[in-house]
């Protein structure tokens, strides 16, 4: 019996697929805890009663690799007293491209 599920929304098909998986899990009483602490995960967590919490990874100096979100985007919330608050006044996911590091990456169109 599955007691909880940790899903990487980017690997299962994105936000729409994440909502579908979460709905199915909720139907069977299986809470979903999104893997990785990025804005899309925070939005999915806060949009569902079936996600009790989300992972959070503090930003620290690391080699560039899976930590692209640390460098490529700005605007992610910082937790206060163990909680994250999403700003309702910012468009989309609430993040923007960080121009400071943009030239460090090759952008393919």
Q: What do the predicted segments below correspond to?
A:
Residues 64-109:
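C-terminal extensions of enzymes
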Residues 1-83:
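Shared catalytic-loop signature of beta/alpha-barrel
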């Amino acid at each position: 019996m599955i007691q909880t599920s940790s899903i990487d929304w980017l690997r299962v098909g994105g936000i729409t697929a994440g909502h579908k998986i979460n709905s199915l899990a909720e139907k069977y009483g299986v809470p979903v805890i999104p893997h990785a602490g990025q804005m899309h995960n925070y939005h999915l967590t806060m949009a569902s009663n079936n996600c009790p919490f989300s992972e959070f990874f503090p930003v620290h100096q690391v080699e560039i690799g899976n930590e692209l979100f640390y460098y490529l985007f700005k605007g992610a919330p910082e937790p206060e007293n163990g909680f994250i608050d999403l700003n309702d006044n910012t468009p989309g996911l609430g993040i923007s491209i960080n121009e400071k590091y943009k030239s460090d990456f090759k952008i393919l169109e």
